[in-house]
Amino acid sequence: MSLEQKKGADIISKILQIQNSIGKTTSPSTLKTKLSEISRKEQENARIQSKLSDLQKKKIDIDNKLLKEKQNLIKEEILERKKLEVLTKKQQKDEIEHQKKLKREIDAIKASTQYITDVSISSYNNTIPETEPEYDLFISHASEDKEDFVRPLAETLQQLGVNVWYDEFTLKVGDSLRQKIDSGLRNSKYGTVVLSTDFIKKDWTNYELDGLVAREMNGHKMILPIWHKITKNDVLDYSPNLADKVALNTSVNSIEEIAHQLADVILNR
């Protein structure tokens, strides 16, 4: 009970006391005095009740403001929580992508190391050395890209005097595909990689690329990349190292232009 409420209760109690003190024996003058006192007390009580009413209204206003502020605070907390959830999901997604890229790089290094080991063992086991042909350029590509680009490129390079290792020119019926590819990789001065969406899906093309990377890891810079109907983001996702190399692009250069630029590098023109 507040102080004002206590005052009001005391006044009502006094009014009741005065009313109870009025009896049949009360003289007219005393009755008049008591009635006047009751009237004053009632007026005082009315003022107190009015003040209490004002205080109650103010309290309700304050409570409403506090409730509204609390609701706004809850909304802000919910919004911040959602923002944090979105940020956390993005960070998790970025971390997963980073781990995938890291795994691809590790797998490539493992494959390159295995390739070096396989080649070393193969060389050791071949006690009678065979003379293998040498090539200026090894062309690594997906079969889906032969018709529209790779075959015309290989033919144009030959016309320019470049000795090309290209499966249609080199492989014969009965040849071991893996042995011939290993021989071509070992005995080529340079290797051009025709990067396309089909290329990155193939096991054989990845095997060939691992062989070229292994050569480069031994200090021989030889990879000459060509982007064919592929975006930079695709290449970045596949191999950040390849994406960092200066590449020719079939969307910018014609087959003849690409062939001449390759020949200039290979033949030191």
Curated annotation (Swiss-Prot):
Changing N206A: Loss of NADase activity. SMART domains: TIR. The active site is at E208. The record marks W204 as: Important for ADPR cyclization. GO terms for molecular function: NAD+ nucleosidase activity; NAD+ nucleosidase activity, cyclic ADP-ribose generating; NADP+ nucleosidase activity. Keywords: Coiled coil, Hydrolase, NAD. NAD(+) binds at S143, K172, K202, K245. Residues 133-266 form the TIR domain. GO terms for biological process: NAD catabolic process; signal transduction. Changing R178A: Loss of NADase activity. Changing G174A: Loss of NADase activity. Its EC number is 3.2.2.-, 3.2.2.6. Changing D175A: 2.5-fold increased NADase activity. Residues 31-99 form a coiled coil. SUPFAM superfamilies: Toll/Interleukin receptor TIR domain. It catalyses: NAD(+) = 2'cADPR + nicotinamide + H(+); NAD(+) + H2O = ADP-D-ribose + nicotinamide + H(+); NADP(+) + H2O = ADP-D-ribose 2'-phosphate + nicotinamide + H(+). Changing E216A: 2-fold increased NADase activity. It comes from the Bacteria. Changing L177A: 2-fold increased NADase activity. Pfam families: TIR_2. The keyword DNA repair does not apply. InterPro entries: TIR_dom, Toll_tir_struct_dom_sf. Homodimer. In the presence of NAD(+) analog 8-amino-isoquinoline adenine dinucleotide (3AD) forms filaments with 3AD between monomers; conformational changes occur upon 3AD binding. NAD(+) hydrolase (NADase) that catalyzes cleavage of NAD(+) into ADP-D-ribose (ADPR) and nicotinamide. In addition to ADPR, also generates a cyclization variant of cyclic ADPR (cADPR), termed 2'cADPR (v-cADPR). Cleaves NADP(+), but does not cyclize the product. The TIR domain mediates NAD(+) hydrolase (NADase) activity. Self-association of TIR domains is required for NADase activity. The TIR domain alone is active and produces cADPR (residues 134-267). This is 2' cyclic ADP-D-ribose synthase AbTIR. It comes from Acinetobacter baumannii (strain 1295743).
